[in-house]
């Protein structure tokens, strides 16, 4: 019998290439048909390995989900970047590779990040999701998130409504 080893840890500079690949795959899966094609390609190209190398060295926490020494997910989080979510903590990004979705890894990553925020006095957490990303909205609702606000992003001349979720 073979068991699978899964860990959640801080990202390291050596993770830059796998994070760039993961970002490319997860964003294409999540946003194809939601974000206009040219804008999506531009965003993906901006998140190169070099960008991720810098992200591993910034003060905002970046953690990865590693399974059998492969990075299959990541999250970026920290103090809230705005006030609309009415929460002191915010998860900026949380993505799991499509082949690993539905296995509980996203839930586990969310809990780990939420616990880390709470350990730093940021017990109430907010997160934004594009309204058209039904899978993400269902994920956050399933975790107990309450939709508390709406806002818009603009990308390549397209208005992208987003919904804010809060967790207590």
Residues covered by each model-derived region:
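Terminal substrate-recognition subdomain of acyl/acetyltransferases
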Residues: 2, 161-168
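Acetyl-CoA-dependent GNAT
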Residues: 2-6, 10-16, 20-99, 107-116, ...
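Conserved GNAT acetyl-CoA-binding A-motif
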Residues: 118-128
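Conserved acetyl-CoA-binding loop of GNAT-fold acetyltransferases
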Residues: 141-149
């Amino acid at each position: 019998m073979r068991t699978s080893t899964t860990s959640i840890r801080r990202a390291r500079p050596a993770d830059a290439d796998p994070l760039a690949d993961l970002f490319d795959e997860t964003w294409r899966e999540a946003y194809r048909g939601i974000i206009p094609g040219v804008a999506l390609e531009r965003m993906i190209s901006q998140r190169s390995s070099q960008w991720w190398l810098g992200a591993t060295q910034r003060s905002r926490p970046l953690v990865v989900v590693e399974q059998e020494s492969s990075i299959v997910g990541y999250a970026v989080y920290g103090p809230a970047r705005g006030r609309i979510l009415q929460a002191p903590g915010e998860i900026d990004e949380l993505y799991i590779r499509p082949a690993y979705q539905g296995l509980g890894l996203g839930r586990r990553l969310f809990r780990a990040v939420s616990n880390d925020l709470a350990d730093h006095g940021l017990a109430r957490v907010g997160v934004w999701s594009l309204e058209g990303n039904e899978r993400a909205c269902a994920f956050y609702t399933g975790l107990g998130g309450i939709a508390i606000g709406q806002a818009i992003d603009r990308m390549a001349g397209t208005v992208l409504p987003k919904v804010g979720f809060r967790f207590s």
